[in-house]
Structure formats: structure tokens, C-alpha cells
């Protein structure tokens, strides 16, 4: 809103106004504006006749108001058009028809903390409700902190598709795909997994992918380079004719044009209120253009589903319950796992069943069908090292400790093998006596098995 954008307010009031009482209107407005970070000044008008029960009064010292306008006005200059940072490969005709003719709409948002946290997402839902006032919407917030495209590909079925047919889908993963160290192949397989699975579930679904900004992306764009994760996500978007909104490039360009600064205004990859306004304004601009001039006589049309870019992409990704495992020794099911060491975790991954081991030699196995197998774990201060074998082949090792494990039981998605034959397999997992030098133990807490197939 205005406060987030730093717009100052000068409010002239009559102290005896009975038509619009200050206690019910002006005073709450000013207090809330200041709480929201805005600058507000009040000028009580006490001289001269107070007419219409104090609602009409003469303006005192108009020079003060003129000075306020002069000191806070910016020179008129053009700002960058958000549309130049949008790749509109297709219109959002199908969701438009659904919203206008069927009067119902299910809209899902998937991403990391930038999606989960309140801000741009709330403003976009408000825009859709105002744009289609007769439509009954269901909005799904499937944003979870620390998750990018690979987690998203395995989360999609249970956290989004299980809610019903999706009409409009928003996805962002560029920040976490970099932060969490997924390589180029994994970024393509993850994003294609999400987009293709979504289109298989509903060929009519309209999809928008957003590229969020971080300091590293600003540095690369400034140096004339395109960040790898954006290249990879655009590869998928282009292949599936999906629209994209490049917030990362847009913020970089606006900073270069001196519209605002990173340090004072946008502040962080988790945007300030001002930054949330930048994101919302851009995406709403895109939606306004995408929904413009669509005929009410238009008919829905299935999006073309091309051959996959990579046959091993995670478009059949899903969770498998940890209770499907066969315990051989020293593992157990904690029905409502929560951290017990005083270190926090993500709420979406607590108070649910976890397959837990805490000492070397613990062993279990799982039979599954598919092309890929992995685990979603809570990686905390005592995260250990696992050894795993598929179909009796030699054991491999995987360190479960992350750079964040000392301070949080982080939900961590690990794809152990991803180019298997699409048939039944058996994986055996055991705890190694080895551990990361920074870890306090030999623990593994599996929240879900990940299967692609």
C-alpha cells in the first residue's frame, strides 16, 4: 500500500467534527498508517467558523500545505514498464472462461518462503477477486520455506492436485534452486516435473512462472549474464508455452534506473513491504494484460503437451508413506515427530509420522515402483550419514547434514537415484558410523519417501 511505498500523508482535521468523528476515522487511520511504516502529519484546524457540525472549516496556513507538497514531490519522470519483463507466450483464456462463465476458480501458489509469507500473493488474490467479482475462488497457498523445484515436484500431488482441478497456477523456485545447490539437470527435472505433472492433471490449466530476485542474480544481470536457474526454468517454460514474469531482471533494471535501491527499499530476497509492492504491481500488470480483450465467446482449449525435455524429469513425483518401509533393526516410527533438542523446524513437517534412527547400524528397506527414489528428511544438528543400496548393488553414502542443520531441522529433499528402469525396485538404507565433522550424531528422520513413477 501507500505506507509501504513511503508516501507521506498530511491530514487536515476539525477537532469538533461530528459528521466524520476523529476517534472513529482520522485517529485510527493515522495510527495504523504509522504502524505500517508510513509518515503521517496531522494539522488540526481550530480557527474560523466551524460549519456543518464541525465538518467544514477554513484551511489555516496554506503555505504549510504547499511546502509539504513541494518537499515531498518527485520530479516527473518515466518509470520502466513492467511488461518488458514478462514473457507472454499465451493468453490466460482458459482460466478467464472458467472465472467468467463457470463463476468458480481454484488458484494455487507454489514456491518457497517468498510465496508462503504474506505480501504479493495476498495482493494478487485481492486483484483476482476484484477483477472477477462474481466468481467464488478457492486459493491454495502451497508455499513452504526452503523449498524449490525438486521438492515442489514431489509435493505437488498431495499438496496441490489433491485439492481438485487447478485453473490457474503460480510457481516460483529460482531463489531456492540456487540457495539449495541443485545443479542444472536437477533444476530442469524439477521444474519440468511441476509443469508437466500439472498439465497432465488438467490440460486446461494456465500456468505462470515467476523468477524472484536475490543479490547474486542482480550481480549476474548487471554483468550481462543470465542466472543459470532462470535459463533452466525458461527452457521448461518455453517448451511448454508457459508465461513467465522475471522479477529478478525487473528489480535489477529498476535499481539501475535509480527508481529505488536494494539496501534502503527492497532490502532482502525476502522483500520488504515496498518490495512486495514491486512484485505485486508487476504480476498484476501481467494478469491485467493477459486477461485483456478476451472474447466472452471464446472456448476453452487444451494446452499442447509436448514430449518431455528429459524423460527422467519428476513429472510422476509423489510421496510414499514412511510406514511402507520394512524395519530390519534400530529404526522406529515416531507418530507425531517434533524436535526434542530445542532447535526449531518447519511447521508443515512436524507433528506427523517420521521414520527415525539415531545410531550406526540401523537398517530398513522399502519396495517401490518407479524411475527415481529419494527421501525427505528433517536435517538437524545430529544429522548423520546413510548408506543405501538398490536391488542389491554396492552401497553408496550420503551425508545428510546441511549448512543450516546446526540451527534448524530443515526439510531436505534428497533424490538418491533418478535414472532407474521404470519397474519395481528395493532400496536398503542403513546408518553409517561416519558423520559430518559438524554434526552431533548419527540420526536420520525420514518424513516421506520420494518416488517418481
Model feature map: region roles:
Residues 77-109, 114, 128:
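Membrane/wall-proximal cationic-aromatic binding patches
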Residues 12, 108-111, 210, 375-378, ...:
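Short hydrophobic segments within beta-strands
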Residues 1-35:
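The feature captures the conserved acid-bearing segment of alpha/beta-hydrolase catalytic domains
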Residues 104-119, 144-148, 372, 381:
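Catalytic nucleophile-elbow at a beta strand-turn-alpha helix junction centered on a G-D-S/GDSL motif
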Residues 8, 104-107, 138, 372, ...:
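Residues that mark the start of a beta-strand
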Residues 122-138, 142, 147, 151-300, ...:
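Alpha-helical cap/lid subdomain in secreted, periplasmic
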Residues 292-367, 376:
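Glycan-recognition and processing domains
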Residues 24-30, 34-76:
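C-terminal catalytic histidine-bearing segment of alpha/beta-hydrolase fold enzymes
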